[in-house]
Swiss-Prot record:
<keyword id="KW-0687">Ribonucleoprotein</keyword>
<dbReference type="InterPro" id="IPR005290">
    <property type="entry name" value="Ribosomal_uS15_bac-type"/>
</dbReference>
<dbReference type="Pfam" id="PF00312">
    <property type="entry name" value="Ribosomal_S15"/>
</dbReference>
<comment type="subunit">
    <text>Part of the 30S ribosomal subunit.</text>
</comment>
<keyword id="KW-0934">Plastid</keyword>
<dbReference type="GO" id="GO:0009507">
    <property type="term" value="C:chloroplast"/>
</dbReference>
<dbReference type="GO" id="GO:1990904">
    <property type="term" value="C:ribonucleoprotein complex"/>
</dbReference>
<keyword id="KW-0150">Chloroplast</keyword>
<keyword id="KW-0689">Ribosomal protein</keyword>
<dbReference type="GO" id="GO:0005840">
    <property type="term" value="C:ribosome"/>
</dbReference>
<dbReference type="GO" id="GO:0006412">
    <property type="term" value="P:translation"/>
</dbReference>
<dbReference type="InterPro" id="IPR000589">
    <property type="entry name" value="Ribosomal_uS15"/>
</dbReference>
<dbReference type="GO" id="GO:0003735">
    <property type="term" value="F:structural constituent of ribosome"/>
</dbReference>
<comment type="similarity">
    <text>Belongs to the universal ribosomal protein uS15 family.</text>
</comment>
<protein>
    <recommendedName>
        <fullName>Small ribosomal subunit protein uS15c</fullName>
    </recommendedName>
</protein>
<dbReference type="InterPro" id="IPR009068">
    <property type="entry name" value="uS15_NS1_RNA-bd_sf"/>
</dbReference>
Length: 90
């Protein structure tokens, strides 16, 4: 992981972020994964923050739906993405 501008950025996503790249399924899953990890670390400190917990569950659902779509459309890109993001497959 590299730090760039105070944010952690994975090496495979350092490519120039063009407008078309931001709409790709891979970029959206990457973005949701970063938000999920940030919220999970927040909830470790603030266990009774139920509104953030609800937001985390919504993000998990959105990411799960996007991953299901990608797995159905292009299995190779799906496998590559989950290995790079270090998330498990269901």
């Amino acid at each position: 992981m590299k730090k760039k501008g105070g944010r952690k950025i994975f090496g495979f996503m350092v490519k120039e972020e063009k407008e078309e790249n931001r709409g790709s399924v891979e970029f959206q899953v990457f973005s949701f994964t970063n938000k999920i990890r940030r919220l999970a670390s927040h909830l470790e400190l603030h266990k009774k923050d139920f509104s953030s917990e609800r937001g985390l569950r919504r993000l998990l659902g959105k990411r799960q739906r996007l991953l299901a779509y990608l797995a159905k459309k292009n299995r190779v890109r799906y496998k590559k993405l989950i290995s790079q993001l270090d998330i498990r497959e269901k």
